[in-house]
Amino acid sequence: MDNELERCKPWIEAALEYSGGTHDFSDIVEGLHKGVLQLWPTPKGCLVTEIICFPKKRVLNVFLGGGELEQILDMHESVIDWAKAQGCCALTMSGRAGWVKPLKEHGWDRQHVSYVKEFD
């Protein structure tokens, strides 16, 4: 996994620029090594996912995505199959507005909009 992770590092770091400063690359490495996060590499992109257990649902959250959109979207069915095998009933994702159209084409619905107010 470390070779793939290093190869995917530029895409992960680029995606982290939009994460609001919640994580850095070393946090992703730690999460992957602990098994809390999952890496989905493609030749020209990757996803990082996490399973979130809510009181009523278990979902697979697409935490980070970067690289060529087509290759990322090509993994869609494989990610769903894996999520189902883990007992998840949905995929979730927060992202930039540019994700709206390609996700809609794959059956995703926009559920809400996130807002942030940072303070000291």
Protein language model regions, located:
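Generic recognition of cysteine residues
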Residues: 8, 46, 53, 88-89
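Short glycine/proline-enriched coil/turn segments at helix->beta-strand junctions
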Residues: 41-45, 85-88, 109
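Short glycine-aromatic motifs
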Residues: 37, 105-108
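Active-site rim helix/loop that mediates acceptor-substrate recognition in acyltransferases
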Residues: 16-37
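Short amphipathic alpha-helix that is part of the acyltransferase structural core
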Residues: 1-23
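Conserved donor-binding loop and adjoining core beta-sheet/short helix segment
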Residues: 33-70
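Conserved catalytic-core motifs of GNAT/GCN5-like acyltransferases
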Residues: 94, 109-120
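Acyl-donor binding region in acyl/amide transferases
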Residues: 57-106
